[in-house]
Amino acid sequence: MKLRYMIIGAGGVGGPVGAYLSKSGADTTLIERGKHLAVLQEHGLTLVSGENERESIPVKAIDMDGFLAAREQGAPAPDVIFVCVKGYSLADTVPFIRKAAGRDTVVIPVLNIYGTGRALQAELPELLVTDGCIYISANRIAPGVIQKHGAICRIVYGLPSHKIDHPVLQQVETDLKNAGIDPVYSPYVERDTLLKFAYVSPNAACGQYYHAKAAEMQHPGEVRDSFVRLIKEVVALADKMGIPLESRPGELVERNLRILDALAPTASTSMQRDMEAGKQSEVDGLIYQVVRLAEQYGVDVPEYRKIAEAVKKQTENK
């Protein structure tokens, strides 16, 4: 089965995914805009990793209007759409997806925010929308150029039905493997996306509170201790939500510390970078949402409350 892929957003998440799929020979179209799009079209996407190792990969890229114009002229719909935008931009993709998709198009959101798949499915009831997330540390450093921090690139996706027999999603698993991406077609995707959130949310919260990059969190001390406390609070919240994340106490802390310690020392979260630049960020979904859920489920999250209050003051003072 030969699938046509669309990647909405070619930044630190969608850029590498689109580049790897394109390099493997998969029919892949990246949706972007502005200067980033112009460079992608002229020079391809450049991935920078390690000690300034650079690889430029030819990609097919277009903006939303251009793709819809092509659809009106008879261009085929994508079989699979990976949604790789920031959480605050998710709603903006819905009208485009409605027009770009075909009847059998499958939508796979891989955002940082927990519950994205359910939210998108409610907006697109006519399409099949999975839950999903991605493990990657990368960011755009210039138009057409993505800096990777570490080798990990894992996409987790699946359906609330717990079934893993959908032929398109099975083919996605094969195509991702062929592209050098680690796929997890999960029968327990709600748990697995919350597992990802239990890493990225503490990482973003701790990093923003202490203005710390990975290096400060990779060594014993207050910053690393805070990261651990945040993980434990998400675990407690998940237990109250009926989605246990651990088979034994401390398991998730150990797992997340291994992920953290494998990052380049210069790595930081996209939320931190956006907040430092005064841009719109995912702070609501990554920090404040945990406090709201804790109130809803009656869970004490003192570390999150402390950080949420401090971050609100930081933003109010800017």
Please report, for each region that a protein language model flagged, where it lies by residue.
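Rossmann-like NAD(P)(H) cofactor-binding subdomain of soluble oxidoreductases
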Residues: 57-145
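N-terminal glycine-rich dinucleotide-binding loop that anchors FAD/FMN and/or NAD(P) in oxidoreductases
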Residues: 45-64, 200
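Active-site-proximal catalytic alpha-helix in oxidoreductases
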Residues: 190-218, 222-235, 260-261
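NAD(P)+-binding Rossmann beta1-loop-alpha1 motif at the extreme N-terminus of oxidoreductases
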Residues: 1-54
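Rossmann-fold dinucleotide-binding core
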Residues: 76, 112-196, 202
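NAD(P)-dependent Rossmann-like dehydrogenase/reductase catalytic/cofactor-binding core
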Residues: 2, 178, 228-318
